[in-house]
Amino acid sequence: MNDINLFLAKLTYTSAKLTILPEIILILGLVAVVVIDLLSKGKNTFLLYKISMVTLLASAVILLWQWGFFTAYERSHARDFGNIFRFFLLICSLLSISSSVDYILCSKMSLAEFLLFKLAAGLGGMVLSCANDLVTIYVSLEFLALSSCFLSGYTKRDMRSNEATMKFLLMSGASSSLLLYGFSLLYGLSGGQLQLDKIVDGIIFNRYGSIIYLSAAFTTAGTAFKLSLFPFHQWTPDVYEGSPTPVVAFFSVTSKVAALALFTRLFGLIFPYFSNEWHVAVGLLATFSMILGNLIAVTQRSVKRMLAFSSISQIGYIMIGVLSADSGNGYASMITYTFIYILMNLGTFACITLFGLRTGTDNIRDYAGLYMKDPVLTFSLVLCLLSLGGMPPLSGFFGKLYLFWHGWKAGLYSLVLVALVTSVISIYYYLKIIKLMFTGKSGRSDTPLNSRQNSLVSLSISISKNSLEIAMIICALASTLSGIFIDPIIEITRNTFF
């Protein structure tokens, strides 16, 4: 009996120390999806969906257990930061898969391929969030980017989707090239080091200061592409509009969260002694992102293009949290608002996915009179849009309040003032949709777009009758309730300064 207890204790300790166990579980899930799809010849779709959800849940549970173990025995701020973003990526994958199944079945596409690429993208993002060397960072970033690119072109017969894929692939390749060149400069300046902490030691007393600035510039440009920061945002509206809506929902949060973790780790660990210089540069990018994103979003007629420009402005707000980090609060304001943004954005995209399945359109004018047809969808979309706009008492308001207050304390007065003004502008185009849903007259019937979708409704019901509605309601409620429980969230995210 004592031997069994000793064995179990050793197994528990070994599992807790194996920090990549959540990623290993995801890899096993990937293999299981591929093997079962081959054996069943694509017929057992419910089992594939079930395996994906169980894999993500198991990975999240293991991650939380390991996090609690390390918190109790060996505290590490860098590990806390990585674990938070790994958990965020698992949440993104869970909610996006549950809100995508109906769409994929109605599109008559292979569910196995879709789940494979989503799990692969989540895996790449998780590895990227805690990577400590340049090689792992680059490989995991490309893994995430290629998986997202394949998802973007998932509907192969759609010309808009093919165009979006080509733009995404070209721009992603260009940004990766810039980032790789920045890494090569860091590698040379540090004397051939790959580990981030050793690179810092190698460049502190380096005499080639101008090359260090050049490396920081290329690194900023490469990560700004992934974040859709001005002026590296040009690909975002076209890719958002052309890609399938559930795919846009997925990489609008997944790629942003992973790239944000990368940006923060690189500049927080490698360039802390040049903070004045890169703070000015990133502050300018954030300012123009907030102004441009909100002003152009006002003029859009497509909901997906509007949300694309909205996401550009949102990442500008989040940059305030990155620039205002300190040893007392860490990156608490940035992480807190990122978590709230995930819920708001996924909830909004779940609503427009459901609307698109019924009408086949994403034109803002077609939302007229939606309240009379589907009150649940209408109120869910209202909650998510108002939260994105920062209206009280929703979570977006409390997230922005904490973010802007933290930025004001850090002396980022001009950035905070711009953020406040542009937040007011954003409320206008969100309220425009809300007003249309309640007061407009609809001329479009609330039925699926074509007979092919009609024939697949029964198949969709057998697999995931309410998965999209459930994901939509969960995100809508979370967009409200997470603001009420914001204090515990802030407390968890405080010890994250490198």
Curated annotation (Swiss-Prot):
GO molecular function, one term: NADH dehydrogenase (ubiquinone) activity
Compartments reported by the entry: Plastid, Chloroplast thylakoid membrane
The keyword Transmembrane is assigned to this record: yes
Cellular component, GO, one term: chloroplast thylakoid membrane
Classification via Pfam families: Ndh2_N (PF19530), Proton_antipo_M (PF00361)
Any one of the GO BP annotations: ATP synthesis coupled electron transport
Residue stretches in coiled coil: none
Biological role: NDH shuttles electrons from NAD(P)H:plastoquinone, via FMN and iron-sulfur (Fe-S) centers, to quinones in the photosynthetic chain and possibly in a chloroplast respiratory chain. The immediate electron acceptor for the enzyme in this species is believed to be plastoquinone. Couples the redox reaction to proton translocation, and thus conserves the redox energy in a proton gradient.
Alphabetically ordered keywords of this record: Chloroplast, Membrane, NAD, NADP, Plastid, Plastoquinone, Quinone, Thylakoid, Translocase, Transmembrane, Transmembrane helix, Transport
Species the sequence originates in: Adiantum capillus-veneris (Maidenhair fern)
Subunit structure, as described in the record: NDH is composed of at least 16 different subunits, 5 of which are encoded in the nucleus.
Name assigned to this protein: NAD(P)H-quinone oxidoreductase subunit 2, chloroplastic
Enzyme class: translocase
Catalyzed reactions per annotation: a plastoquinone + NADH + (n+1) H(+)(in) = a plastoquinol + NAD(+) + n H(+)(out); a plastoquinone + NADPH + (n+1) H(+)(in) = a plastoquinol + NADP(+) + n H(+)(out)
Transmembrane segments: 18-38, 51-71, 87-107, 111-131, 134-154, 168-188, 211-231, 244-264, 278-298, 306-326, 337-357, 379-399, 411-431, 470-490
Family per similarity comment: Belongs to the complex I subunit 2 family.
Note: A second copy of the second exon exists; it is not known if it is transcribed or not.
EC nos: 7.1.1.-
Signal peptide location: none
InterPro entries membership: NADH-Q_OxRdtase_suN/2 (IPR010096), ND/Mrp_TM (IPR001750), Ndh2_N (IPR045693)
Membrane topology listed for this record: Multi-pass membrane protein
Superkingdom: Eukaryota
